[in-house]
A protein has these predicted regions:
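Surface-exposed, charge/polar-rich loops and edge strands
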Residues: 12
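Short, small-residue-biased leader/transition segments that mark boundaries at the very start
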Residues: 2-9
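Solvent-exposed, non-transmembrane regions of membrane-associated and secreted proteins
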Residues: 17-184
Length: 184
């Protein structure tokens, strides 16, 4: 009969310690990697979401009949005229009804998009400046004119700069007098 040596629990402790240390280091590495990649991944995801909103907007606007298209712009012109008649539009805009219906062809709040070629920015513009929306897109500042042109109108568009999760207007400081942008 042969006797095989048995391992004592004290012999296994260094192996267990090594595994625990390895798991802790792996966890720290994964947390660090996640923190490092978050801005890039989040910006990429927001870019996809923004592009999808713009494509959906374009598709719906192109499918509008000329009559519906005219009606949407006439309502925005009417809103702008009513806004111009107010003494303090930025504080009295609530007196005008139908803000959320203006230029809202898809019913999702997108009223257009801004394209700034010089800094490679193309962002959807939504009604209002709700903080959760401004984390991934531009907002039309309520109380300013809708961006449809016209004498005496002044549209104000807002977006964040310097968010780690989305580029948005981060590079706006690279624009110079004379640079152009398009609102569609």
């Amino acid at each position: 009969l042969h006797s095989f040596p048995t391992r004592r629990s004290s012999d296994l402790e260094p192996v267990r310690k090594h595994k625990v240390i390895t798991l802790i280091l792996l966890g720290v590495f994964l947390v660090g990697l996640s923190l490092l990649l978050y801005p890039s991944v989040s910006n990429y995801w927001n870019s996809i979401t923004q592009s999808r909103a713009i494509v959906d907007y374009d598709t719906i606007v192109k499918s509008l009949s000329p009559k519906d298209n005219t009606a949407y712009f006439e309502r925005a012109e009417e809103y702008n005229s009513e806004l111009k008649a107010l003494s303090f539009p930025l504080t009295e805009y609530q007196q005008i009804s139908g803000y959320d219906d203006c230029l809202n062809a898809a019913g999702d709040g997108v009223i257009g998009y801004i394209d700034i070629d010089k800094i490679q920015v193309k962002l959807p513009i939504y009604h209002g400046t709700d903080p959760s929306m401004l984390n991934h897109a531009c907002g039309h500042i309520q109380g300013s004119s809708f961006p449809i042109a016209g004498k005496g109108t002044h549209a104000a568009i807002s977006a964040h700069r310097g968010l780690p999760s989305a580029k948005l207007f981060t590079n706006l400081d690279q624009l110079e007098v004379g640079d152009t942008f398009t609102i569609t």
